[in-house]
């Protein structure tokens, strides 16, 4: 059983402190309980309360995936179209810190595994402005695809904010030399983030003015942060960014239990759980759902999704508690490729 399910199913052990500025005003906070990451694998979850079904914390988690991607299978089908990997906020394709330091890859081990599929399919790792606006990032995404796909149709797999970039490119920019057959989003905040609200409203421990100054001194933009709020995504972005009937849309979400005390995602997880329910530390399950929702990855964090798992943590868990990893990011993305192949994409 996963740690997420074993410890109260993605719930805090003690009642959370109220966040009056963030709790939805449609119903009293005391009358609602966030939908937790619980239940039996592959079962659809019925909300605990139905007083206000529009409350995001009460949405269905869909299929819960606990160990389907624990190991890499012997065979995966290969999609017929190239795959584009679109990174999230503050992401990169490859980061070099010096001539004597090995480069850091955002898609650690994932892009290489996809390229090793039968037929050696083309895999394009896009590189967009790390903290630029959705519009800026989408334009660069389109340019990267046009330059590297060279007229071939593509399937986009996007992590986090990368999914918003891809949606904007498909709906607004519509590059003549880019033909997108499918978009698979992984933990993309399609309905914004309560944690972004928290930061923008000046309630967080991080002072945005200081953060913006640091980012600008590094030569990067800061427009992305304000575009991840729930107000902007729900009020501006989604109404003006309709899906294309020529593109297949798929999505995955993830949830994890309360992060360790010193984890940088502990506060963001708490805020998201109180306001939106089950989440991966940065994006809620409710916000991740778009198009054909394929399921919720249980006991998987936002960084686990791109193979940035803490190997030391899992080694300790295995030695002291006998726990083994139930999620392998490489197996997950190979399965997405297999799914696309079976869909004829």
Question: What do these predicted regions represent?
Answer:
Residues 61-78:
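Short amphipathic alpha-helices and their capping/turn segments at secondary-structure boundaries
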Residues 89-91, 129-131, 163, 189-191, ...:
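Short, solvent-exposed loop/turn segments at secondary-structure junctions
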Residues 1-55:
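N-terminal mitochondrial targeting presequence
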Residues 87, 135-241, 280:
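Serine-dependent carboxylesterase/thioesterase catalytic core
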Residues 76-154:
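Active-site catalytic motif of lipid deacylating hydrolases and related acyltransferases
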């Amino acid at each position: 059983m996963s740690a997420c399910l074993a410890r109260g199913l993605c719930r805090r052990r003690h009642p959370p402190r109220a966040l009056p500025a963030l709790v939805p005003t449609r119903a009293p906070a005391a009358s609602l309980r966030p939908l937790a990451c619980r239940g039996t694998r592959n079962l659809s979850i019925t909300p605990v309360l139905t007083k206000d079904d529009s409350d995001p914390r009460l949405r269905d988690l869909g299929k819960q995936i606990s160990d389907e991607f624990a190991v890499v299978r012997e065979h995966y089908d290969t999609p017929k179209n190239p795959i584009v990997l679109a990174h999230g906020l503050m992401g990169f394709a490859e980061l070099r810190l010096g001539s004597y330091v090995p480069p850091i890859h955002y898609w650690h081990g994932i892009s290489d595994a996809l390229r090793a599929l039968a037929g050696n399919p083309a895999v394009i790792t896009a590189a967009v402005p790390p903290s630029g606006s959705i519009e800026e990032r989408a334009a660069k995404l389109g340019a990267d695809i046009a330059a590297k796909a060279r007229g071939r149709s593509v399937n986009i797999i996007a992590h986090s904010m990368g999914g918003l970039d891809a949606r904007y490119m498909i709906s607004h920019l519509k590059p003549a030399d880019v033909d997108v057959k499918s978009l698979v989003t992984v933990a993309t905040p399609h309905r914004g983030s309560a944690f972004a609200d928290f930061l923008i409203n000046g309630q967080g421990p991080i002072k945005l003015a200081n953060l913006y100054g640091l980012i600008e001194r590094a030569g990067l933009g800061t427009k992305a942060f304000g575009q991840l709020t729930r107000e902007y995504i729900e009020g501006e972005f989604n109404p003006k960014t309709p899906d294309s009937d020529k593109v297949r849309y798929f999505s995955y979400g993830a949830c994890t239990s309360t992060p360790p005390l010193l984890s940088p995602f502990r506060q963001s997880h708490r805020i998201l759980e109180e306001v939106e329910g089950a989440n991966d530390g940065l994006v809620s399950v409710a916000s991740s759902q778009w198009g054909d929702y394929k399921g919720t990855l249980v006991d998987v964090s936002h960084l686990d999704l791109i193979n940035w798992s803490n190997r030391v943590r899992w080694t300790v868990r295995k030695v002291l508690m006998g726990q083994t990893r139930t999620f392998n990011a490489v197996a997950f993305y190979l399965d997405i490729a297999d799914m696309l192949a079976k869909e004829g994409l």
